[in-house]
Each structure stands twice: as structure tokens, then as C-alpha cells.
């Protein structure tokens, strides 16, 4: 089996495990908020995870933040497993770029920078747009019912794309991606 690229191995090696030593203080803070314990469900889990990632710092620093909406077509759509036809991917990307999707409302409300990444949409390139990042790994994935959806190289390219996007966001001053 071929090995991972040195760059990907270096990125993986640089990932520090989260420190659970701050969990009691983080959980105590969540439990002392004016709300029933655990009533925020998954949001409380996310807050505790951010608390760990930031080494127990309070308040949590998530501003400025950026969300990457990464778009691509899936070959398995040919099997009729999707609620919508493949063409909807392109329509949704245009909707994101024109500010007409739910993610746009959430980002605008929270003051979060939204970027749309074409990592594998079928068809022609999208017209330039300030929120669009064109980084196609492939023109869609293959149909996983007939074989692997991605090659090993495509998978690695997709992982490195995510790392590149996170690094650029950090360089731009984002504290949360």
C-alpha cells in the first residue's frame, strides 16, 4: 500500500490531542448558566470541545470565524439515492454565492465569513466571485456502487485542501473555522 505524502504526514503529526484536564471547569461553567443542565444538547458538547481546543481559555474565542461550504457532485447520485437531481448542486452553489441559502442567513446573523469552495462540481467553472474558491479535486466523485468513490490521490488532495483552507483562514486572522 502506498504511503501518505510527507506533507500530510507532517500535518497529522502536528495535531495535538485535546487536553481533557479542563473539562471539569468547562462543564461547571455550562451547568451554571441560566438554563436546565444539558438542555442545549449538541451545542453544549461543541462548547466543551472548543473549551478543550482553546486550552480552557474563557471566554471562548471564536471571533472572527469563517465557514467553508465545500461543494462537489457525488457519482452515486446516478443510483437515484438523492432527493434532488445532480443539477441541484450547481444551483445551490449559485444560491450560496447570491446570499439566498440558510447558511447565508446564519453567517450574516452571527457575523461569520462564508466562503464557497468548488472542490468537485461537475460542469464548467463558476464565474469569479469574491466568496468563491475554485479548488477542484476532481469533477465529482465516481459511483461508489461500482468501485471507490475517490482515488487515494484524490482523497489526499481533498484532505490537503481542507488543511490549506484552514491555514489561509488562520493567516487571515480567523480564530474558528
Residue ranges and their predicted role:
Residues 1-177:
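N-terminal loops that bind phosphate or other acidic moieties
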